[in-house]
């Protein structure tokens, strides 16, 4: 019985460690920036921030989108146009303003 208890405890601790190491990123969209941290899907490896200049925007603030992603995408893979910048990072909540 003691062996089973130890095995169960090891399994629970392993799950807690995996959850603690999960990547967290800001995931939101807003003009000029935004922040809302949340846990990423298990396969995510990067936090990504895109900034798109909207030519009709009176205040000239970029539309900022923050998300989790598998890898660091390039602009064509996201289907975005020429007025876009992308920044990627790999630590939790690293895609802050």
Swiss-Prot record:
Pfam families, sorted: UPAR_LY6
GO biological process: acetylcholine receptor signaling pathway; regulation of neurotransmitter receptor activity
Gene3D superfamilies membership: CD59 (2.10.60.10)
Keywords associated with the record: Disulfide bond, Secreted, Signal
Signal peptide boundaries: 1-22
Annotated Gene Ontology cellular component terms: extracellular space; plasma membrane; synapse
SUPFAM superfamilies: Snake toxin-like
Superkingdom field: Eukaryota
Keyword Signal: yes
UPAR/Ly6 domain location: 23-95
PANTHER family per the UniProt record, alphabetical: SECRETED LY-6_UPAR DOMAIN-CONTAINING PROTEIN 2, UPAR/LY6 DOMAIN-CONTAINING PROTEIN
Subunit-level organization: Interacts with CHRNA3, CHRNA4, CHRNA5, CHRNA7, CHRNB2 and CHRNB4. Interacts with CHRM1 and CHRM3 probably in an allosteric manner.
Function: Binds and may modulate the functional properties of nicotinic and muscarinic acetylcholine receptors. May regulate keratinocytes proliferation, differentiation and apoptosis. In vitro moderately inhibits ACh-evoked currents of alpha-3:beta-2-containing nAChRs, strongly these of alpha-4:beta-2-containing nAChRs, modulates alpha-7-containing nAChRs, and inhibits nicotine-induced signaling probably implicating alpha-3:beta-4-containing nAChRs. Proposed to act on alpha-3:beta-2 and alpha-7 nAChRs in an orthosteric, and on mAChRs, such as CHRM1 and CHRM3, in an allosteric manner.
Name of the protein in its database record: Secreted Ly-6/uPAR domain-containing protein 2
Gene name in the database record: SLURP2
């Amino acid at each position: 019985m003691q062996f089973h208890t130890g095995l169960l405890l090891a399994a629970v601790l392993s799950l807690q460690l995996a959850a603690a190491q999960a990547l967290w990123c800001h995931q939101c969209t807003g003009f000029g920036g935004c922040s809302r941290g949340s846990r990423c899907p298990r396969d995510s490896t990067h936090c990504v921030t895109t900034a798109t200049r909207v030519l009709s925007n009176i205040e000239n603030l970029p539309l900022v989108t923050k998300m989790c992603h598998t890898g660091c995408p390039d602009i064509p893979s996201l289907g975005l146009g020429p007025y876009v910048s992308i920044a990627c990072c790999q630590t939790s909540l690293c895609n802050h303003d």
